[in-house]
Amino acid sequence: MVHTTSPLLLLLLLSLALVAPSLSARKCSLTGKWTNNLGSIMTIRAVNSRGEFAGTYLTAVADNPGNIKLSPLLGIQHKRACQPTFGFTVHWNFSESTSVFVGQCFIDRSGKEVLKTKWLQRLAVDDISDDWKATRVGYNNFTRQRTVEE
């Protein structure tokens, strides 16, 4: 007995066999230069074997924009996942505040890397009675800045 297979089914199976490995093999990488939805620029240097990384953050927004300075960041990510979760802290060099970000590195449907983050910013206050207003919460979405060669 001979079975015939439709050409459409063969084409579909061949397409899946060729496309599926490339989708799963692509890994989202934190290393590089990123811009968020507000225009801030973040640079993450190489992630080490333990998932630790360092970099810089230049915010585009601040209570006193004239004082903005490049600020250091330190973080860690999970290394095994293709779309890893991560967290980092920014020590602001121009104000008495610290921010922590948590997020995940995604590859969107068009193949672009996107960092989806939530953050807390702790401001210094002079009195414990002002504690209620010392923590801000927000989100940022970062996209990779492409180099000239890309």
Curated annotation (Swiss-Prot):
The keyword Translocase does not apply. The keyword Disulfide bond applies. Residues 1-24 form the signal peptide. Biotin binds at residues 36, 40, 57, 59, 63, 95, 99, 140. Residues 26-147 form the Avidin-like domain. It comes from the Eukaryota. It is found in: Secreted. Glycosylated. GO terms for molecular function: biotin binding. GO terms for cellular component: extracellular region. Pfam families: Avidin. Gene3D superfamilies: Avidin-like. Glycans are attached at residues 93, 141. Disulfide bonds join 28-105. Keywords: Biotin, Disulfide bond, Glycoprotein, Secreted, Signal. InterPro entries: Avidin (IPR005469), Avidin-like_CS (IPR017889), Avidin-like_sf (IPR036896), Avidin/str (IPR005468), Avidin/Streptavidin-rel (IPR051764). Belongs to the avidin/streptavidin family. Forms a strong non-covalent specific complex with biotin. Homotetramer. This is Avidin-related protein 3. It comes from Gallus gallus (Chicken). The lineage of its organism: Eukaryota, Metazoa, Chordata, Craniata, Vertebrata. The gene is AVR3.
